[in-house]
Regions:
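Extracellular beta-rich repeat passengers
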Residues: 1-297
Length: 297
């Protein structure tokens, strides 16, 4: 037991409709998939650990909870937290995070989604994620070494608005990018990202609409190429829309090769970008067009 809760180890895929109870702490060991057609229901305030370390049987080489396309999540408030090999909470991100896979055609690393399969459905009122993902130790400023694969905290892959219904997403101290949205179009009411190892929001040929709250704190560290927004156009244009009357709090380097259209947010400069306020004068857009797909340095 820990935190007065029983430890339940999860080693294999979730193949039947399952309930996670808040009297337990569930530990994800290796690559655990919630299979297509299967629903995972999580009681309010349940804690789920993602175990750190190398797992050779995982296609990602680390632990991850992956909701396959066609699977379902039903939750109120849930906590995803990194843990060590002794099932203790860890402040070192060394895992592959949590993945939500929809039914739009998409691929990231070894994980694919397929168009035309049973729709996914992911609902949670609040998700808190701490120390998810992993960072390459050589990816430091002025390093001449080539970084190897790293892992993001939360990945949204091939999802549409009908599939992704997470209302509040809080990601703190992620190992790589905090939230990676790939070939998706989703709306999230509230987003909070605090001190990711790299970018706060990585948007790859996707659209993201933020409705009520957008708080992104990417304080300066010795890691190079670390931005508030990393907008990529590998498979088509990408943009972020911030709705009118959204509370916005941004700190960090804005991000290159992006365009900001806003009557509220000031235009980014080369240095530290700071903004705190409400978008009272209309919607704001941050985008990059595929036609301008320059190769990154």
């Amino acid at each position: 037991m820990t935190d007065n809760k029983y430890i339940i180890q999860i080693y294999g895929n979730i193949t039947n409709n399952t309930v996670f109870y808040n009297k337990n702490i569930y530990v994800i060991n290796g690559e655990v998939h919630v299979l297509s057609g299967v629903s995972l229901t999580i009681q309010n305030d349940t804690i789920i650990y993602i175990k750190n370390g190398k797992f050779t049987l995982s296609s990602l080489n680390k632990s991850a909870l992956i909701f396959d396309n066609g699977s379902s999540l039903y939750a109120n408030t849930v906590y995803f937290i990194a843990c060590d090999k002794l099932n203790r909470r860890s402040i070192i991100p060394d895992n592959a995070g949590v993945w939500f896979c929809g039914t739009l055609e998409a691929q990231k690393e070894t994980i694919k989604t397929n168009y035309g399969t049973q729709p996914s459905y992911f609902y949670a009122r609040k998700i808190y994620a701490y120390y998810l993902g992993s960072t390459d130790p050589v990816k430091q400023k002025n390093s001449n070494l080539e970084p190897s694969t790293d892992n993001d905290g939360i990945t949204i892959l091939g999802c549409n608005n009908d599939e992704f219904k997470i209302q509040f997403l809080h990601v703190e101290q992620s190992g790589d990018n905090a939230i990676d949205i790939v070939q998706s179009y989703v709306t999230i009411n509230n987003i909070v990202v605090l001190n990711p190892s790299e970018d706060a929001l990585n948007i790859v040929s996707s659209s993201l609409t933020v409705v009520n709250t957008l708080i992104l704190d990417v304080s300066l560290t010795n890691v190079y190429d670390r931005d508030i927004f990393d907008i990529e156009v590998d498979y088509g244009s990408s943009f972020i829309k911030i709705n009118k009357y959204c509370y916005v709090e941004i700190k960090g380097i804005f991000g290159d090769q992006t365009t900001l259209v806003s009557n509220d947010l000031p235009q980014p400069t080369e240095g530290l970008y700071l903004y705190k306020g409400v978008t009272r004068n209309g919607q704001s857009y941050i985008y990059r067009n595929a036609i301008f797909n320059e190769e990154d340095d």
